[in-house]
Amino acid sequence: MKVLVTGATGFVGSKLVDRLVNRGALVTCLIRKGISNSAVKTVTGDLTYPDFIFPDEEYDVVYHLAASWPGEKDKKILRAVNYDGTVNLFSLLKEKTKFIVYVSGLGVFGNPRNNIVDENSPIKPHTEYAKIRLEAQKFLESNCKELGIAFSVAYLGDVYGNGGWFKNILVERLKKGSFRLPGSGEYYRSFVHVDDVVSALESIIEKNAINQSFVVADSTPVTFKDFVNLICKELGVKEPGSIPTILAKAVMGGDFVNLLTTSIKTSNNKITSICDFVYKSYVEGIPATISEMKS
């Protein structure tokens, strides 16, 4: 199987690439800078400046993970990376692939109040970041349908594991005593371990789950405060204090803080019907992750 991955050097993308290679897939990565995996082909380029070409070959599937960080404050950059980059990618690949899997986030569901979010829930993004991600999704859906290209979308919960924001921002700052909870921390979040995200993305292809959407999160929504406190327990450090939401927005950006502090509880019944999660709950995943970091 030939696979193209965008965002291949990111937290999720790099793990996905490693798994695909181990499964025997022929993987090509679209990157802006070097990649350490010598077992893959690379195409160097920036989707916001598509002055490059892909090899003259077809891909069984394209995983589109490339996106800006939700904390990006410049709206022009948000649009250039998340929407324009997606349009440019499709233009380059529309005759080279049979299936596109778009990787998005739960932010597109906006504020569901007390409702449990699943694949049939209303899509009502309330941040600029999520609105642009949804716009890109709709572009792909429409154009894939027109050209007969299979399309599916994975809405990821907050991804944790040994790397990415979880390690480099949350864990490191908790260890230094410099992390503060935005607001009360009593808002619910739906987390998912990076290994289970990779398994879910694999399963969408293995089960040929075309033209569908999947909520990818574990089965135990938890308040951000309780999630952080469990990390502190495993690290053996003091639980953090909090800062007013308005101050957090000034530091981390309004969109990012709005996404983080909006309560969202999800059902993962659909994705777990085709994929077995290793860490069915953060209660299992956090101790395993912190143990891995210490080893």
Describe the predicted segments one by one.
Residues I204-D255:
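Mid/C-terminal beta-alpha module of Rossmann-like enzyme folds, strongest
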Residues N143-R189, V194:
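NAD(P)-dependent short-chain dehydrogenase/reductase
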Residues A80, N111-V153, D158:
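Catalytic helix-loop patch of NAD(P)-dependent Rossmann-fold dehydrogenases
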Residues S281-S295:
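Amphipathic terminal alpha-helices
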Residues T44-D84, L92:
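NAD(P)H-binding glycine-rich loop region in Rossmannoid oxidoreductase-like domains
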Residues V3-R23:
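N-terminal Rossmann NAD(P)H-binding glycine-rich loop of SDR-like oxidoreductase domains
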Residues V87-E128:
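Conserved Rossmann-fold NAD(P)-dependent oxidoreductase catalytic core, especially the SDR/UDP-sugar
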Residues L134, L147-I149, V159-I169, S203-F214, ...:
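Glycine/proline-rich active-site loop of Rossmann-fold NAD(P)-dependent oxidoreductases
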